Amino acid sequence: MATLVEETVPVKNAAVAASAFRLTVEADGLAVLEFDTPGEKVNKYSRPVILEFDRILDGLAARSDVKALVLISRKPGIFIAGADVNEIAKADKGADPEMIRGPHRTFSKLANLPFPTVAAIDGACVGGGCETVLSMDWRLASDSPKTQIGLPEIKLGILPAWGGTTRLPRMIGLAGALDVILAGKVLDARRAKKAGLVDEVVPAAILEEVAKGYARRKIGSKKRSNAGPGGGPVRVREASLVEKFLEGPGKGIVFSKARASVMKETKGHYPAPLAALSVVEKGFGAPFDKALEYEVEGVGTLIGTPTMRSLVGLFFRMEEVKKETGVEALGVGVVKPRRIGRVGVLGAGVMGGGIAHLAADKGLPVRMKDIKPEALALGYAQAARIWKEKLKKRRMTPGEFSRKMSLLGGSLDYAGFETCDITIEAVLEKMAVKHAVLAEWEKIVPATAIFASNTSTLPITEIAANAAHPERVVGMHFFNPVYKMPLVEVIYGKKTDPEVTATIFDLAKRMGKTPVVVKDSPGFLVNRILGPYIAEGARLVLEGVDFTAIDKAMRAFGMPVGPIELLDDVGIDVAAKASETLSKTWPDRMPQDPALERLVTAGRIGRKAKKGFYFYESERRGGPDPDAYRDLGLSSPSKNSSPSPSEIQQRLILPMINEAAFCLSEGVVASPAKLDLAMIFGTGFPPFRGGLCAHADALGAKAVVEALQKLAKEKGGRFAPAPLLIEMARTNKKFFA
């Protein structure tokens, strides 16, 4: 079609020197609005961009030649990433409500355009991006895996306040909307269509062409974006009888169940889901404009709070990782990672099978090796089980399942490993075994191949000691279960080539993980800091404290599990071995734990043996096993030893802060920000507290040092504060300025 008009609207702002939008109107009245923020990798809404969009909508509404509109992005893999998080981060409590009401007006203008509107979504369409398309009549999404649509604001400690909390329930129904809003979910195109969030899923290569044709066919059709009650959107699918009941007389049941679910999930530590639920509850069925005002009120209670600041800080740290190569702190200049095309895995047990599944899931061919056929079978079965679960939930097609399974291969020898760019070993955690498999492997692979050890405690430098090429030996420590835990520690030894470190860092990101680079040191970072947490928990039990009270206190603090539950989960024997490793290096600060040794001697090693501190069989499952006290040489918890929850929390958290300070002083990790990222993603340290160092800042260095000195006097020298903390207390410094 011939083009009648092409125009841009420049924004007079230093941050946006040129127009973020380009409008084209074709001869038949089809307008195409392209979003392409200059100088940015993603489209996002800063205040100037919102103002520009607003002016364009005013212009479109006044035109008589426009018959339909298609909104499309020119950023590869990105539709609209939402609001500029930098602006959110700067907002204080009681921030100008115009930052919410302004976009409300803009998106209402979009909804009220006097002609049909179609969103052509290719790539991330989240937050304000999703709220944009909720204000349009029809939504088409590409089948690209990068196309993700949803409202993740809850994960930033706020709520979808640009119309999302109001429009989504009216459009797709109450239950489906709450599922997205309260969990901060983003959906792929297929799931978004099933939810009613998009109308069609289209091959990415022809999305624009299809969207234009779709919009032309809708010329003259009744609008959906403002034809619902009070000027809101219409419901895209007719409600079932059950839905009609639950959105009418029975809606109290829906909100009651949702509130109970939120409390179970968050323990009340995160105010945003409850605030969002309240906004939906008040706004659902209210006049549309009034419902939007509830969003203004609701988000106003969340902006600038400590929880919001902690979660936004976490977001920025994750964004930094995406841009990094992993060697910035090593002082080696610019290093490009190698591209990994094929992965080998030595050891096909629980960890090895999990790593093989993860690599194949990201499209990498994998070759597994084990000395036992049954272990290889377990590796295959583990991958199949995870994929079958996705298949069952319709998050994967049968064809995708078959393709991914075909990427897995296995053998009892090294056949095929000569073509692997990297081999990840997950064999027995014994140095002699690591040395043996490394020596065997080096005989059959080219000099360019990388050997990555999944060891959790053994020094990488020592593993590489006898290697012909120690520069290609590196640590790649996954956490169990591999498919769930987001952290990977990338550990460089004394001779590890920075290019190898950068390659593992890049591979971890390709696998969907968050990598943190760590210097070779006993326990590395996470297990070293976690050591005192577990050890002090066990010592409290030996002192006669009820272990269920210890776990309860730490869950109340925000930890996902208490130290005693964690012992059962990781294996008491594994924890005892880690304690032995750490105590060899720091005998005064981390003396070997006698409680763990006693339990291992008694055969009480945790969940895997169905014999730990808790029951794992019969009707008593999950309850405390009183015989654990007997194996520790105790008759039962002492009635004379019942510290308060806050005393338990202090006893367990302060040594972690102390060890974090030692790690930073020794250069084990580059910064407090990286340390906090590792502790949140590796241990589940409560994100609402911002991380271990952020929590220490909230307490204040002086208070931390005084509390540690008091504990050192009462309980022993292992609590002696780190020199870094003492200096911070003296100079009134913080980990984060």
Name what the model sees in each region:
Residues 76-80, 126-127, 458-459:
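Short, active-site-adjacent cap segments at secondary-structure transitions
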Residues 71, 84, 132-133, 192, ...:
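Hydrophobic/aromatic residues within transmembrane alpha-helices
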Residues 2-72, 94, 101-102, 108:
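Conserved CoA-thioester-binding segment of acyl-CoA-metabolizing enzymes
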Residues 68, 114-116, 148, 450, ...:
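Proline-centered loop/turn at the N-terminus of a beta-strand
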Residues 48, 62, 75-90, 107:
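Amphipathic alpha-helical interaction surfaces in cytosolic regulatory modules
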Residues 3, 17, 21-28, 36, ...:
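N-terminal glycine-rich phosphate-binding loop for ADP-containing cofactors
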Residues 74, 104, 108-156, 160, ...:
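Glycine-rich beta-to-alpha active-site loop
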